[in-house]
Amino acid sequence: MPRVKVFFDITIGGKKGGRIVMELYNDIVPKTAENFRALCTGEKGKGKSGKKLHFKGSKFHRIIPEFMIQGGDFTEGNGTGGESIHGEKFDDENFKEKHTGPGVLSMANCGANTNGSQFFLCTVKTTWLDGKHVVFGKVIEGMDVVKAIESKGSEDGAPSAPCVIADCGEMK
């Protein structure tokens, strides 16, 4: 089964930041990968929240240098919201893949089996997250854009400039 590739076109402080291309592990975590892919395309329409199930226009709301950049809350925009294509939350699929270094794509959660739409991209190796967060892909192009977003972060995670997913979708 070929791995799916998706993209984010990023703006940083209202200016073009570049493109991040990610490969999804649809062969290892199909449910998690499909959730992310469909949230990139927006093809599922509106969710239970009444908001479109789509990352387009959402922000990286939590950016911690030398750790990760977190986004995917398209309902509230502050880390308290988001929802999956499978309903509000869904279970951890498996923990086969690990947080091995920069570019790892993983699900953000608030405990076991609470996956929604929030995700993070690691900027360093984060082994303490293994077995707690489902890794479902990796950056294959645009780590420079990830680093540019990371540079707008702070110790408490508050961004110094808006880092927005201006457009997103599936690579064909």
Swiss-Prot record:
GO terms for cellular component: cytoplasm. Disulfide bonds: none annotated. It catalyses: [protein]-peptidylproline (omega=180) = [protein]-peptidylproline (omega=0). The keyword Protein biosynthesis does not apply. InterPro entries: Cyclophilin-like_dom_sf, Cyclophilin-type_PPIase, Cyclophilin-type_PPIase_CS, Cyclophilin-type_PPIase_dom. Residues 7-170 form the PPIase cyclophilin-type domain. Its EC number is 5.2.1.8. PPIases accelerate the folding of proteins. It catalyzes the cis-trans isomerization of proline imidic peptide bonds in oligopeptides. Belongs to the cyclophilin-type PPIase family. This is Peptidyl-prolyl cis-trans isomerase 2. It comes from Caenorhabditis elegans.
